[in-house]
Amino acid sequence: MYRFCAHAYLLLKYEKYHNQNQQLKKLWASFRCLFRLAAFALPRRYQSFFEAELILKNSTLETRLTLYRRLRSRLRLKNKNYTRSSSIMFNIQTTFPPHGEMKTFIVLREVDLLLLSLEFMNVSLARADLLVRNLHYFAIHSTLVMLHQYEYIYLMLTSGFCRYLGVCFFMIIQKYVTPGVMLGRWKVTA
């Protein structure tokens, strides 16, 4: 599953599907199906990430904040002896597109990406501290890639660090800007 997603991401990354709407729809359907199946196939320690995904899909701010606090509390309990765990948080941003409809999406900070990956992989606290202090070596970036307006797409956050741990991260991002615009940058390893 992850191998397929990595391949699909690379195709999207190099804009092969930008002008092929039919193929993009098929690719999106594949991502959606894989993500739904993964939620049932992964061990329990991975479920926190799928709760984070639910924050995006809930319509009310109150529900999103409730799920967010539950996820943050779980991560704090798991890393209760690690001082940086208290800084884990999702940056929930609300934007207003030209047509006035409110859109909400989540941007993960670099430290959050690192700590979440450590939580998923059960890395020891000593190792976690070492990786946090050397964060800049791994070049983890929170990136929004805009392919088409007002559509959802699952993106794999790829970096040298994620490849090192063998972890694939997915985010749902609701786009509201001009298609093809890239914010931030991706570091894709071979």
Curated annotation (Swiss-Prot):
List the membrane topology term(s).
Answer: Single-pass membrane protein
Q: What happens when the gene is disrupted?
A: Deletion causes a vacuolar protein sorting defect.
- Report the locations given in the UniProt record: Membrane
Asked whether the keyword tRNA-binding is assigned, the reply is no
Q: Which GO terms describe its cellular component?
A: membrane
Where is the chain membrane-spanning? 152-174
Record's keyword terms, sorted: Membrane, Transmembrane, Transmembrane helix
Q: Any keyword Metal-binding?
A: no
Which superkingdom is the protein from? Eukaryota
GO BP annotations listed:
protein targeting to vacuole
What else is on record for this protein? Partially overlaps RGP1. Disruption phenotypes caused by deletion of this gene may also be a result of a defect in its overlapping gene.
Query: What is the recorded name of this protein?
Result: Putative uncharacterized protein VPS61
- Lineage of source species: Eukaryota, Fungi, Dikarya, Ascomycota, Saccharomycotina
